[in-house]
Regions:
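Catalytic cores of DNA base-excision repair glycosylases
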Residues: 1-105, 109-122
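Intrinsically disordered, low-complexity, charged terminal extensions of DNA damage-control enzymes
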Residues: 91-175
Length: 175
């Protein structure tokens, strides 16, 4: 970047730890760039307003929501409107259009909200839960010959680290 701070969301994403939504927020607030953000609060607001019922756990559906979020962005006077629009969406999701008990009667966009019109705004966004992972304890055996070679074996295909080469292991019962 030749000593210059990035000025676009695309450039900001090249910095370590800056993802798409954070980069968009910075670009919107600081430079008035017309770019959508999609943090958790904004996802909740947009899926409810649009009655977007596609499962956001599927990347194609998340891409579609990004596209719709972009379509809804202001188009004029961007240096002033983009920071206000972005902050407004974030605040709406954090304070009124909350996850557990949305306060629809206080919402400034209730007349536009298709989720409210369904009578079930709380069912949005749709995101299937990931499977809960169980904890396993393993003891690894380290066996080394005098010449420095180590005993390794190919793990069975199903299961954790399937078909990988590893030290022999034993499952340990957890109490």
């Amino acid at each position: 970047m030749r000593g210059q701070f990035p000025r676009t969301a695309e450039q900001l994403q090249t910095l370590p730890g800056i993802g798409r939504s954070t980069a968009a927020a910075i670009a919107s607030f600081c430079f008035g760039e017309r770019v959508a953000i999609l943090d958790g609060n904004v996802k909740r607001v947009l899926t409810r307003v649009l009655a977007f019922s596609a499962d956001l756990a599927q990347s194609a559906n998340e891409r579609e929501l990004w596209s719709r979020a972009t379509d809804l962005l202001p188009e004029q006077n961007l240096p002033e409107t983009m920071p206000r629009y972005t902050q407004g969406l974030m605040d709406l999701g954090a304070t009124i259009c909350t996850g557990r008990q949305p306060q629809c009667l206080l919402c400034p966009v209730q007349a536009l909200c298709r989720g409210l019109a369904t009578g079930e705004p709380g069912k949005y966004p749709v995101k299937t839960r990931k499977l809960k992972r169980s904890a396993q304890a393993l003891s690894l055996l380290w066996a080394q010959r005098p010449d420095g070679s180590v005993w390794l074996e190919k793990r069975s295909s199903p299961g954790i680290w399937g078909a990988s080469i590893a030290c022999p292991s034993l499952k340990v019962t957890m109490n």
